[in-house]
């Protein structure tokens, strides 16, 4: 059932009221407030139902200028009636991509976990900040419990962690802590007292946020040394050591190495143990960006060899809003050493972080972070963990990997139509669709160019039809190819078949 903006009617009286006629402005408006909110919930629940209906479109696509004409985006000078606000809610969701739809394979973060969603509703209702225990006591304690559990899963008995607004900021916290650990005076004196130029290392398949750290923190992207990867997308560790020695010979100071556990495009896992050996040899901080692949830490079947040696890292980024299915946003950064976060980022603002409070101020988290205020991202994860249990998360990871194997099987069974690019380590499946005119043509670089031209055409048709969303992109070895992501618990084998069949229907004539 598509959402009909005109299908959600408040009573005639309530519909004519404005927000000023509801609580808290009008304290006696309990019945009207309840009627309004229940109608909003009707809209939300219908969207949940539509999201899980395979007969519904994934999206109703319109080009930006056309979309502007369909929507009333004006922000008025005077308050609009409540009925209009209800229609605004329904209209917004009518044209929103259903990222929880079983035929949405487009992004790393997809799915609509209803327990996590319920947690986000409660979080919005509580509307509290996460910088001190005095205003968020329950949520601060939840955060401690969940993050301690995640560090134990990594393999650490102590340490410290924080929830950050996305994997990019989590990686930034790792960079800042690494620099502070090696040069604690940098916080006060900046680069003036450094004995040389700092350099960091990461693979050419890393998330762009690693280079962004170098830019944001004044290192400069020229000093973020890119290490080549092999044909599977893994960092070539011999090249890492060669480049470290090369920069040391120039007088530079290697201090930070990023290993990626689940690259964005190919889903590759760098060789953590070998990189840890190199970091130990040359006294470099080892960070693991497991924003994408971190969920597999919970699977005894798939944890090794992908994460063998993870406990040797100094810091780990892990995003539950990806493979674990928590709602956006839910990103964590973990440190082996306790006390680094507070030492690195503390500014001791006396209007927030007084030392003479009536409770243990070690529970105040605001001075650990550069943000001050933090959104409450913990409750939805805590509630989801309670609902699934650690065993449930493990089963979820195993099921996603099982579906990937099913997709590989179906691709191999249709080898005339599909060309698998490589065996995936994660839930990223990279492939080309081969239309009728190119079947039987020997596979070479020239054919790959033609296959690459087909991807954006099929994606365009896909979006116009609205039945499916699968991403595509090039990399440094290949022209455009499809990259499907199976990270939603809603997906089953029939959905994988639909994906491949629909790509064939949309592209066979090209």
Swiss-Prot record:
GO terms for biological process: gamma-aminobutyric acid biosynthetic process; glutamate catabolic process; larval locomotory behavior; neuromuscular junction development; olfactory learning; response to mechanical stimulus; synapse assembly. One of its GO terms (cellular component) is cytoplasm. Keywords: Decarboxylase, Lyase, Neurotransmitter biosynthesis, Pyridoxal phosphate. The keyword Lyase applies. It comes from the Eukaryota. SUPFAM superfamilies: PLP-dependent transferases (SSF53383). Homodimer. This is Glutamate decarboxylase. It comes from Drosophila melanogaster (Fruit fly).
